A protein has these predicted regions:
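The feature captures the beta-strand-to-loop junction immediately N-terminal to the Walker
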Residues: 12-14
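Helix-to-loop junction immediately C-terminal to a conserved catalytic motif
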Residues: 27
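Short coil-to-helix segment of the ABC ATPase nucleotide-binding domain corresponding to the Q-loop/switch region
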Residues: 56-63
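Conserved ABC ATPase "signature" region
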Residues: 74-92, 143-144
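Conserved ABC ATPase signature
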Residues: 96-100, 104
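Hydrophobic anchor residue at the start of the ABC signature
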Residues: 110
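A short, proline-enriched helix->beta-strand linker immediately N-terminal to the Walker B motif
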Residues: 115-119
């Protein structure tokens, strides 16, 4: 399949079908047959299990991508600090990752992925470890800021609502070995908001996705 610049696509399919393997193949972390071509200078990656550095405090973990790109440490920390306020992590800047809850670590990983500022963002179950309230907040934030981010996003998720709300297209995969069973275009206007979930088109898309998955 092909993904276009600035597009958000989701990969939906049964557990173990190979969704994460597709992400790893794009990153060059696994061997595969075939060809993957990509434009763009860099890739940001948020895996299912966070890869935070336990010897660094939360703020340093979040600001690391900016520092690696040449931004002065204090300026990088200031940028990250603003994100902490947006994501409910204010007051935890000095905590080490092992002192944070699973949901907090997930939010911290998301902040770090966003601050990588890459042309391509690969998100593997990015909101899977957070509670329902936080998950909705993160979905709304990402939807609101997609244009500003300017990244092409490939997301793995098991959440049908999430896939419809965030994506331009959804690829439904078969059981292993994964094949694309169906591509579904999401025609909902952007930016999307809470009202989008009540849109009749949203309900039709949800029904269509479920019919494909459970057929």
């Amino acid at each position: 399949f092909e993904v276009f610049k600035g597009e958000v696509i989701s990969l939906l399919g049964p557990s173990g079908c190979g969704k994460t393997s597709i992400i790893k193949a794009i990153l060059g972390l696994v061997n595969f047959e075939g060809v993957i071509e990509r434009n763009g200078e860099g890739i940001g990656y948020m895996p299912q299990k966070d890869i935070l550095f336990d010897w660094m405090d939360a703020l340093d973990n979040a600001s690391l991508p900016l520092i690696l790109k040449g931004k002065k440490k204090e300026r990088a920390r200031d940028v990250a600090r603003k994100m902490f306020r947006e994501f409910g992590l204010e007051g935890f800047e000095d905590k080490k990752p092992y002192q944070l809850s699973g949901g907090m670590r997930q939010r911290l990983s998301f902040i770090r992925a966003i601050l990588s500022g890459r042309d391509i963002l690969l998100l593997d179950e990015p909101f899977g470890a957070v509670d329902a309230y936080t998950r909705r907040h993160l979905q709304l934030w990402l939807s609101k800021n997609l244009e500003k981010l300017g990244s092409t996003i490939i997301m793995v998720t098991h959440n049908i609502e999430e896939a419809i709300f965030l994506s331009d297209r959804i690829f439904i995969l078969s059981d292993k070995p994964a094949k694309v069973v169906k591509e579904i275009v999401v025609p909902l206007k952007r930016p999307r908001c809470l009202d989008t979930f009540g849109n009749p088109t949203f309900s039709k898309l949800e029904k269509e996705v479920m019919e494909v998955i459970f057929s």
